[in-house]
Every structure is written in structure tokens, then in C-alpha cells.
A protein has these predicted regions:
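Alpha-helical transmembrane segments of multi-pass inner-membrane proteins
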Residues: 527-551, 562-572, 576-578, 591-598, ...
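Aromatic-rich peripheral "rim/lid" segments of glycoside hydrolase catalytic domains that contact
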Residues: 41, 136, 145, 150, ...
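Long extracytoplasmic/lumenal interhelical loops at the membrane interface
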Residues: 866-880, 892-932
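Noncatalytic carbohydrate-binding groove/subsite architecture in carbohydrate-active enzymes
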Residues: 162-291, 334
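Glycan-recognition surfaces in beta-rich domains, encompassing non-catalytic CBMs
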Residues: 353-522, 526, 530-533
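A membrane-periplasm/extracellular boundary helix in multi-pass inner-membrane enzymes
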Residues: 542-560, 580, 627, 648, ...
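Transmembrane signal-anchor hairpin modules in multi-pass inner-membrane enzymes, especially those
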Residues: 5-17, 21-26, 495-680, 690, ...
Length: 1016
């Protein structure tokens, strides 16, 4: 039985984990587009009647128009959408007057679609027509739609252009609002299509292009056409290549990405096509039966009401498409060519009579909503509803959902709202001794502002009644609106918890019987590995031997053994350059494949290449319409190569490596703790996307680099090579900057016109930060003497040191010149000279003081004493704001890469308004505390303590001059990290993060360097 459980436990753990992942993916798919919780109060209110229908009644007789509109109104529709075609000197104002008058008489609202056969060529004349139309009907029409399907060549009149349509909106939008101050201007309904031009443009892409061209300010609501095509409204697949009702969500997501989430998204045409109802059917819109058409239509309305608070009016296509019985759009029609009602309109009328105005759906609703019933005495305006001073002040609001909130105007006044839901106290409000739930309207800070207050949640699905009684608060316009939330009915909680329980139970059993489970897994892995190894070895061997035959005509692996260092370094460098500079995707991919093979053969060289390209992350490689940092690509390739080596050699791991993996050093534990806390901090981030990105590129990938240095067998030569390549990368940064400075390009003018070098970085301060990490290493290694170093190599270190120092000097980085570099040089002197360090230290101190005195009048130095406007003033304000930020979130911090949003949105001092876009605290202690909380600060302190303890022990005990000076250089670099980090960035840039992990990983590896390791 025990053996059976040992066999079943891994299977149960894996299966339950897969089930959990599948459930979460399905849940994400199901709720996509569904606004969870209470909708944002900035969202525009939903129309009380959200259903409309397209009509084509202009050429009809007055009797037919009146009869048709009366039938539409009696069905329960609140809107009709009519297209008005304009041609120069050919518009029929009389017919338009007649139609609009009948619309108003039948208690309907009209969406007036203004369009023409060739709008782009006559924008000014068309704009004049739109102004005249809005001016003429401003008392009868409030909703105007400019054009229709501009993403199709057939509607736009020529190749579609989002820029042209954006310009049209920019021209006409202000004219309509000038003529009709209550107007709602709709963007043209975008036709759903998967084409990407040139004749037709994907509706999702077209909307993205509209926002990119600046159209956001020139429409009040967006518009799409969520036809169902061949599937029902509960087809929840979402893709640019899929046409279905859910495609509407993709348009909404584009709006949110563009920061336009406060507007509603209207459906100017939607429905399902029944080809049997058309004399001349088309397959363009898919095909369903009449029964499906009815059921799908009602289900779509239900879904939009219950899931999409951002959905505006849904306009069916159509009541009837006109007098032409051969029009293929009869397949959408609610009536037949003979005038009889179809099945859809009959069932729809029954549905609307019950649900249309019975309860407020998911969304935002204005104070004057028809779902709200007020006692006598209330006043209403654009500000909301004002509490009466005399008499009752009650509100009854009927809604359908699981959450309810009030949008109120709070301020420096005394008022109380007493609320009950379904005759019970509201579960999110405090309760008086009398058992009444209440909400105080006095603002905590006494400022006047509009706020959404959650009232109740976890309500049963269905209709609910909220009763509100106000005590005081008149003349404040306290009630602004109502917010209704509706949690998804799709609940996976119990199944997920069950699967999680099985997963944890199986894992617990495996841990308890770890030895037996490990034996079983090792047997299984060896069984499959023996069979997979043959295939992998055969494939890789073929590639290697073909490459050898085509290039050098000799055994490729022999070229990569440690006795021949030039070939692997040269080939790897050439492959890296080919990947980076190649304009052809195929060559880039082939180069990446070659690099993967090379990294597999020599992972130690991979580490050196990563160290080399660290500062060049700002110049990513474009592939697959994305940008990839070379540092990131090389790190992931090296990780993949090491994993491949371990998988292939799993059955023959040496005892040393196995035991090493089981013995984590204190520094390893500190780094893993830091990474874990960083991952956890994502949960506290308001800007989740920014936090995840920073975790990936500034925490996870640098930690991967640290782990690679720790697990790859490395010799002393390998460690020195990694540090040398790190110095070479910094040297290249310095050379590029010096050339730019000589040519007078890519410079920044500081105080009094001082030109500052910035090389490849966006700021001169980044030059000082990065070169400050590499300069101590170059200086320390230049102190080596023969026979431990050749004259040429020592000269190279000296030249690199001089170039980097000059580059730092020309960057005028005060943090580097006044703190970082002096502190690092002091460390080198004391570590290298020991008891004889006093004299050279005094010389350094004298030189530093002399330079400070000489340059004290320099604008970059003199500005430090400005306590009212200079950098010191702004730093003090920034640090004070950061302390307040930490005080509010001492445990979790504000999350990775959320400093900017928290600082700019809440904590910035009014005196520091000139520079709101600061993304870090400019202090190593405050920065880690603000991002990760005090536990995060403790983790970095643990890392630094362990680092210096290890480094000091190595410096005092090692007998190898090269390793001793390498350790001194790395220690001085870390001291630069601390000193410069007191006033500027420390870790939270990609290059600084990799430099930090490189420094601590090499220090740790020096303690167990393997002089006999070979990366073969």
C-alpha cells in the first residue's frame, strides 16, 4: 500500500496542479470583460433604457412611420438609430423633420447617424452640414454618430485611415457641442473584421490607431458592432482572429489601455443572422436558426446588463431594412417583408415588459435615475440630488446585482445617511445601538470631493431594494449617483480549494516520505533520460559535426575545451553581434540558436557575455513586434543551456555538485529571501503590470544570473574573465561617452550651461552610477604586478580606469564624485595597504579637499548649499515624503515600481511640485523600505552583512594575489553602491541590479572556486 501511495502522490500532485491551472485559466476567460466589484464612479452612467433598433424610415409615408415607431415603442425599445445621408445640396430637410417629430411623439430617443458617400474629400462642407443639423434639432436630438464603418473601404470611400477619421472628429465634435450643449457624439460604429488592410482594417487595430492619432478628446462614447456570427453570446473566446459577440470586450480593453475607461461603449448594430428570413441571403454574418436568433438576442442583452457596466445602448440590426425585399439584411429583421412580427420581436417584447425598467443593472446610475424614487422636496441638477431641509428625505432604489454603493459628495458639513438593504442593515456600514446602519458624510480631511462608498456586498443574485434616509446635509448636493456591482455567477472556489487540498496533501506526503519518493522519481527520470539522451545527443552531435565540417574542418568540441580559449570567445562574440545587428529575423533566430549551443558548451563564457552587455539594456533588439533586451535574452539563454546540461547529465551528476546544491550559503538564503519578498510585494502594488515587469527584469533575471554564477563550475580564470568583461562593458560606455563629448553630441546642459556627458544612458547620473561600480574593480586589478599579470593587461586596466574616471568627471555626477568614488578609493587603500594605509589615505583626502575648494564655486557644487530651491531642498522633501509613504505601508511597501504612482498621486510635497515624476527614493534605505517594506530592507541588510563578512574573510586569508585584489575591487564596488546610494539610485535599475548580483555572486564563488572545473 505504501508503495502505491508513493507512486500515486506525484501523479496526484501534478494532476491537481494542472486542474488548478486549468480552472484559473477558465475563470479568467469567463470573467474577462466582467467588471468585478463596484464600477468606478468616473464611468459614465448607463442609459435607463439600453435597447434600440436600427430603422430605415426616411422614404416611408407618414402613416407608416408613425405606425412603425409606435410598434417599436410598445415593444419596449427606448432608442432608434436612423442614418441620414448627406450629399451637397441634396439633403431632404422636410423628410427629416417629419421623421424626428414622429420619434419624439412616440417617446423614443434617436441616434442620428450623419454620413456621406465620400466624407474625406468634403470634410469642411460635411462639418457645416453637421453643425446645421445639430443646431436645427438641438431640442429633439441629443445623440449624433459621425459616419459609419470607417474601417472599411466600402464605407469610407477610399483606403481607410484612422488619422483622416480622427481629423474629421476633431473638426466636427466642437461644432456639434457648440450647436447642442447637451449632445453626445458617438464615434462611428466599427465593423468587425479580421483583415489588416489596406482595404479593410481590423476594428481593434483601427480603434488603437484612432487613440494614437489623438481622437480620444473628440467623441463622448465609442461604438462597435458585436455581431454574433455563428456562435451564441456565451462564446467567450477572445482573439483578433475570432468574430463573435465577445469581440466587443477587445474594443473595451483598447479603450482602457488608452486611458479612456470613463466612456461607455455603444453597440450601434448587433444581432444574429437567420438566412431563411432573407430572399437573398449572404454568408458574411454567419448563420443561425430563428430559434437561435431569438435566444441569442435575449441572452446577449442579459450578458451586457449583468456583466458589462461599460456597455451603452445596444442597437439591434434591424426592425426592417427598407422596401427592397431582396436586401440581404432581412436576415436580421425583427419583422417580415409582409409586415408581420418575427419570433424574436414577440419574445423580446415579453422579456422587456418584465426586465427593462424593473431594476438598475450592473453599472453607474445618475441621481435622477428612474430606478430611484424620492420623497417630496428633493432638488435635482447636474450636480446630483440635494437633501431637502423640511419634510421627509427618503430614497428607494431598486437594483439587480450583488453589490451596492453610493456616490456622494463629502465635505465640511454634518450629515448622516441611514441605509438598509431588503429591510436589513447594510453589511458594510457601522450600526447604531438601534440596529441602523449608517454612513457619515463629513469628509475625514474636511475637503469637498465626490467619493464612492461601498454599502453592501455578497448579496444574493437577483433584485434588491435599498432604502436611504438622510439626516441633515441640505444645500450640499450630497447624492451624486448609485453604483451597482454584480459578481460573476461562475464560481470555482470549492473545486479549486479541493484541488489545492489534494495538491498540498500529496506534496506533504512526498515530503514526509522524501527518500522513497526521490528514489522512485530518480528511477523514473533515469528510465526516460536514457531514452531521451540518445535522441538529444544525436541531434546536437549532428549540428556540431556539420558546423565543424563547414567551418574549421575539425572536431567542434575540441575547439571549445579550456586549452583553446580564443575560439569559443571569438565565436560567441561573433554570434552575439550577428544576433544584435542583423536586420533579418531569420538570421537573428539562427544566431540565437548558435548562442544557445555555444552557451551549452561553455556556460562560463555565457556568464562573461552577460557581464559584457549589462549596460546596453537600453538598446533592445526588436523581434516579433516586441523589444528584447540583450541582457535579458543572454540570461535566459544561459539559463536554458544550464538546464539542458543538467537534464542530459542528470544520471551522472558528481557528488560534489549534488552536495553543493543541498548546501545553501547564508548569502544564497539572503538573496532568495529578497527575491521572495519582491514577489510577494506584487500583491500590494496598485499598478500590477509595472510591478510584474520590474520583478521580471530587475529581480528575477538578476537573481537568475546570481544562481548561474553559483551553480556553474568555475575556475579562478573564469571568475576573472567575468569581472574583466564587466569592466570592458563599462569601458565601452566610457569610450562612447568621451567620443560624444568630443563631438559635442548627446550632451545635457546643467546649471549655467555646464555640459554633462551621458553616453548610452538617458541621464548623466546613470553614467556615474554604473561606472562607479566598475571603476574600483579596474583600479584594484591594475595593482597586480608580474608574474601575476602581464604588462599589456595591466596597462589595459590602467587605461580603462583613466577613461572611466574622466567619463565620470565629465558626467558631473555629484553623488559619484563626492561620495561613491572617494569611498571606493578609500576602501581600496585600506584593504590593499592595511596598516600602511594612513599616508595614502591622507594624500587622497588632501586631493579631494583641494578639488572641493577649487570647484566650490562651480554651479554643480554651489547648488548643493541652496536650501530653498536646489537639489538638497528637493532631496529633503523627497525623503520626507518617502518616510510618510513607508509609515503607511511598513510591512508590504507600495510594491515594485509603484513608487512613482504613490509619490506623484499622494505623497509629493506641495513645495516639490516642479518634479513630480520621480520613480525612486534616491536613498538605498528608503528605496528598499518603500518598495518592499521593512522586511525588504532587512533582506538587503542581510545580503550586505553576509557579503562584507565573506569578503573580509577572503581578503585576510587568501594567498592568491589575483583573487585577493579581485575581492578588494568587488568590495570597493559594493562600498560605492552604499555611498552613492545614500543620495541616488542603488539597485532598482536593470544595469545596477545585474552589477549588484555579479558583485555578490563572485564574492561567494571565490570562497569555493574550483581550479579543476571544466565547462565541457
Amino acid at each position: 500500500m505504501r508503495r502505491v501511495l508513493i507512486i500515486l502522490a506525484p501523479a496526484v500532485a501534478l494532476t491537481s496542479l494542472i486542474v488548478i491551472v486549468v480552472l484559473l485559466v477558465q475563470y479568467r476567460t469567463h470573467i474577462r470583460g466582467h467588471s468585478l466589484g463596484l464600477p468606478n464612479p468616473n464611468l459614465d452612467p448607463r442609459p435607463s433604457n439600453m435597447l434600440g433598433v436600427n430603422i430605415e424610415l426616411l422614404p416611408e409615408s407618414p402613416g407608416t412611420i408613425d405606425k412603425t415607431l409606435n410598434a417599436i415603442s410598445n415593444t419596449g425599445f427606448g432608442w432608434v438609430r436612423q442614418t441620414f445621408y448627406w450629399e451637397p445640396e441634396k439633403f431632404d430637410w422636410v423628410a427629416t423633420d417629419r421623421l424626428i417629430n414622429f420619434v419624439i411623439e412616440n417617446n423614443l430617443q434617436i441616434i442620428a447617424v450623419l454620413t456621406s458617400s465620400n466624407i474625406p474629400d468634403q470634410t469642411n462642407k460635411f462639418a457645416q452640414f453637421a453643425y446645421e443639423f445639430a443646431d436645427r434639432y438641438s431640442d429633439q436630438v441629443d445623440t449624433y454618430q459621425l459616419g459609419d464603418e470607417p474601417n472599411l473601404i466600402s464605407a469610407w470611400g477610399r483606403t481607410p485611415s484612422a488619422v483622416e477619421y480622427s481629423n474629421l472628429l476633431a473638426t466636427i465634435y466642437p461644432l456639434i457641442h457648440q450647436a447642442d450643449t447637451n449632445a453626445t457624439v458617438l464615434m462611428a460604429g466599427l465593423a468587425p473584421t479580421t483583415e489588416n488592410g489596406p482595404e479593410n482594417i481590423n476594428d481593434i487595430l483601427y480603434l488603437r490607431q484612432l487613440y494614437a492619432s489623438g481622437a480620444k478628446e473628440y467623441f463622448d462614447a465609442a461604438s462597435g458592432k458585436p455581431y454574433g456570427f455563428n456562435t451564441g453570446p456565451n462564446d467567450r473566446r477572445l482573439s483578433n482572429s475570432i468574430l463573435n459577440f465577445s469581440r466587443f470586450i477587445l474594443l473595451r480593453e483598447e479603450m482602457e489601455k488608452a486611458g479612456d475607461s470613463s466612456k461607455l461603449l455603444w453597440a450601434s448594430q448587433f444581432g444574429w443572422y437567420d438566412p431563411s428570413a432573407a430572399a437573398n441571403p449572404q454568408t458574411t454574418w454567419g448563420a443561425v436558426s430563428d430559434e437561435q436568433q431569438t435566444n441569442f438576442t435575449i441572452a446577449a442583452i442579459e450578458r451586457a446588463r449583468g456583466e458589462w457596466p461599460w456597455a451603452g445602448v445596444l442597437v439591434l440590426d434591424n426592425y426592417y431594412p427598407g422596401i427592397d425585399i431582396h436586401n440581404p439584411r432581412w436576415g436580421f429583421a425583427l419583422t417580415t417583408p409582409t409586415g408581420a412580427n418575427g419570433k424574436t420581436i414577440t419574445d423580446l417584447k415579453n422579456y422587456l415588459s418584465v426586465y427593462q425598467l424593473s431594476a438598475a443593472p450592473h453599472g453607474i446610475h445618475p441621481a435622477a435615475s428612474p430606478y430611484a424614487q424620492y420623497s417630496d422636496g428633493w432638488s435635482f441638477s447636474n450636480l446630483g440630488a440635494d437633501i431637502p431641509q423640511i419634510g421627509d428625505s427618503n430614497i428607494t432604489f431598486t437594483f439587480e446585482g450583488s453589490e451596492f454603493g453610493l456616490i456622494v459628495r463629502r465635505g465640511n458639513y454634518r450629515a448622516t445617511l441611514y441605509v438598509e438593504i431588503d429591510s436589513e442593515p447594510a453589511n458594510l456600514l457601522p450600526i447604531t445601538q438601534k440596529g441602523e446602519s449608517y454612513q457619515i458624510l463629513t469628509a475625514p480631511d474636511l475637503s469637498t470631493h465626490v467619493e464612492l462608498i461601498p454599502i453592501a456586498n455578497n448579496l444574493k443574485p437577483g433584485k434588491h431594494i435599498a432604502k436611504i434616509r438622510a439626516d441633515r446635509g441640505w444645500n450640499q448636493w450630497a447624492i451624486v449617483g448609485f453604483s451597482v456591482g454584480n459578481e460573476p455567477a461562475y464560481d470555482i472556489t470549492f473545486i479549486t480549494l479541493g484541488a489545492l487540498f489534494l495538491f498540498l496533501a500529496a506534496c506533504g506526503y512526498m515530503i514526509y516520505n522524501l527518500k522513497s519518493v526521490r528514489t522512485f522519481l530518480n528511477d523514473m527520470i533515469m528510465y526516460f533520460t536514457n531514452r531521451v539522451n540518445m535522441l538529444i545527443t544525436l541531434c546536437l552531435g549532428t549540428v556540431f559535426w556539420i558546423s565543424a565540417g563547414m567551418t574549421w574542418g575539425q572536431n567542434l568540441p575540441q575547439l571549445f575545451v579550456r586549452q583553446n580559449e580564443f575560439v569559443p570567445l571569438a565565436v560567441t562574440t561573433i554570434s552575439a553581434l550577428a544576433y544584435y545587428v542583423s536586420p533579418w529575423l531569420l538570421l537573428s533566430l539562427l544566431s540565437l540558436t548558435a548562442l544557445l549551443i555555444l552557451f551549452y558548451l561553455r556556460p562560463d563564457v555565457a556568464l562573461a557575455m552577460i557581464a559584457l552587455v549589462i549596460p546596453f539594456y537600453l538598446y533592445p533588439k526588436p523581434m516579433f513586434e516586441r523589444m528584447f533586451s540583450t541582457t535579458e535574452v543572454f540570461t535566459l539563454l544561459a539559463t536554458a543551456a544550464v538546464l539542458m546540461r543538467n537534464i542530459i547529465n542528470l544520471s551522472s551528476l558528481s557528488p560534489d555538485i549534488s552536495s553543493f546544491r543541498l548546501r545553501l550559503s547564508s548569502l544564497d538564503k539572503a538573496v532568495l529571501t529578497f527575491a521572495t519578498l519582491s514577489l510577494i510585494s506584487i500583491l500590494s502594488a496598485n499598478e500590477l503590470g509595472a510591478a510584474i515587469t520590474e520583478f521580471r527584469v530587475i529581480v528575477l533575471e538578476p537573481v537568475l544570473f546570481y544562481l548561474l554564477v553559483r551553480v556553474i563550475p568555475l575556475t579562478r580564470t573564469d571568475l576573472v574573465r567575468i569581472s574583466d568583461y564587466f569592466v570592458i562593458g563599462a569601458f565601452l560606455v566610457a569610450i562612447i561617452g568621451l567620443i560624444q563629448y568630443t563631438l559635442g553630441i548627446n550632451l545635457i546642459a546643467a546649471e549655467d550651461g555646464v555640459l554633462r556627458l551621458r553616453s548610452i544612458f538617458g541621464s548623466p547620473n546613470n553614467v556615474g552610477l554604473y561606472l562607479g561600480r566598475a571603476l574600483p574593480l579596474a583600479i584594484a586589478m591594475s595593482l597586480l604586478s608580474q608574474p601575476y599579470i602581464s604588462k599589456l593587461r595591466r596597462a589595459a586596466y590602467i587605461v580603462a580606469s583613466i577613461c572611466m574616471f574622466v567619463a565620470i568627471l565629465l558626467s558631473f555626477s555629484r553623488g559619484a564624485l563626492l561620495l561613491g568614488i572617494p569611498a571606493a578609493l578609500t576602501a581600496i587603500i585600506f584593504y590593499y595597504k592595511g596598516k600602511r594605509a594612513i599616508r595614502p589615505f591622507l594624500v587622497l583626502l588632501a586631493v579631494t579637499c583641494t578639488i572641493l575648494i577649487v570647484f566650490s564655486s562651480h554651479p554643480r557644487i554651489a547648488s548643493l548649499t541652496d536650501q530653498t530651491h536646489g537639489p538638497t531642498f528637493f532631496r529633503m522633501n523627497l525623503w520626507n515624503s518617502t518616510i510618510n509613504m513607508i509609515a503607511d505601508s511598513p510591512i508590504t511597501g507600495v510594491g515594485l515600481d509603484n513608487f512613482l504612482y504613490s509619490y506623484r498621486g499622494k505623497y509629493i510635497s506641495p513645495d516639490a511640485w516642479q518634479d513630480p515624476n520621480i520613480s525612486h527614493a534616491h536613498n538605498v534605505i528608503l528605496d528598499f523600505s518603500a518598495r518592499l517594506g521593512l522586511p525588504g530592507l532587512a533582506s538587503i541588510m542581510w545580503i550586505l552583512y553576509t557579503f562584507f563578512k565573506t569578503a573580509n574573510r577572503t581578503i585576510s586569508t587568501t594567498m592568491d594575489p589575483k583573487l585577493r585584489l579581485l575581492t578588494i575591487g568587488l568590495t570597493a564596488s559594493m562600498i560605492n553602491f552604499i555611498a552613492h546610494g545614500l543620495v541616488d539610485a542603488s539597485y532598482w535599475f536593470i544595469d545596477l541590479a545585474f552589477a549588484f548580483m555579479l558583485t555578490i555572486s563572485i564574492i561567494q564563488r571565490i570562497t569555493n572556486v574550483d581550479d579543476h572545473a571544466e565547462s565541457t
